[in-house]
Amino acid sequence: MSIKQYKLYLIDLDGTIYNGDKKIEYAKEFVDYLNANNIDYLFLTNNSTRQPKEVAEHLENFDIDTSEEHVFTSSDATKIYLEGKGYKNLYVIGESGLKNTLSSFNQKENEDCVDAVVVGLD
């Protein structure tokens, strides 16, 4: 297999590695190639319902051998953004993946007296 060498591959998931519950042809071979050749990559997803470990486990359903260190979710991006802004108190609407990723913040039960409202679901 001849693949142009880059320092890093940023790879979307749904529609690129899998399509819903279907494997995408050659996705496994591509990731296997990256792993075998020690090429850095990061799976990106706008799905906030799972944490990176859960995403890596989900990829096993498609025979993709990876780890949570190779997954970056929209929840991760949200956490970094909120930390950079210095926000502490959040009202979070979403699934456990989002809420768990943001667990270092004070999550309030209602939107009164919060710095930010975070909504995520996919």
Positions of the model-derived regions?
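HAD-like aspartate-dependent phosphatase fold
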Residues: 1-13, 17-122
